């Protein structure tokens, strides 16, 4: 009888393991905890699809889970020469992943690999629920709190989650996030596409910073003229986008259901105007903070993800080397990101309101 009971228990464990959507998993020890890395089966457009993921648990877990939503479309990450250095489930490691683990949070992220917008939110929501279940299956309790941290396109997903998923996520940290304000984005892109051919340094070298066309372009992007070295990346992209049909996209509701903190650089000509517009119309205002870090571009200069931008700028877009250099030479918003995450956690878990929205110097403490 005892042998029969043991056999039943083993069989039950095997059935549970077989039912886990986390397949091809490799478990290892990492600094500060343990890591599970492999493929997870998710349902996208009515069918199962396997996506790369990472799930880390700290040696001393604080009971909360942080979900990372990477930028871009997903897939491979490159160094400046074009060599593949990783895939996007680990893209936010140096931004928030390792930091969260060191603070006692479980951390998980999935490579959406081409899935964005509402479908990207659906994928991220599925993944989050599966992670919560998997943690319980592995002997941990269900996370008490779940936070979403998104960068760029992943920030757009975090924004949608903050507006639409109050039962799953307790707080959102958005870094240089997309999806701020559609009307402002369309205005920015239209003006940039019209103005860029008039100041493109490849055709108009040496235009002084005080020239009216330069200041008009600065106003269109929402960035100072000092950010001029970085403009060719988005300027050329805006011209290319203007030749394509405008796709259908809905505007963000700007109605937050959970505490939300945003961090962005003041030289971020991809999203800064939209985020300022979003901050102006967001409701309720006491659920939102916007921290702008002076002189920082869309990607922090010390984020290894900037190398993919450098590779695209030089090798694919054929922009001048100076543009790629400028991307990597800028200051960092990572200290503000991590400080913001701490404020978000305190806001959610103790009710302590974070500092008011403000503009800060790199490495300066929020006040």
Predicted regions located by residue number:
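Conserved alpha/beta-hydrolase
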Residues: 95-114, 344
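Alpha/beta-hydrolase active-site loop
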Residues: 116-137, 336-342
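Accessory cap/linker subdomain of secreted extracellular hydrolases
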Residues: 20-55, 173-255, 331-334, 355-359, ...
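C-terminal subdomain of alpha/beta-hydrolase-fold enzymes, centered on the catalytic histidine
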Residues: 228-367
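Short beta-strand element of the alpha/beta-hydrolase
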Residues: 63-73, 261-263
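Short, solvent-exposed loop/turn and secondary-structure capping segments
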Residues: 76-86, 118-121, 137, 159-162, ...
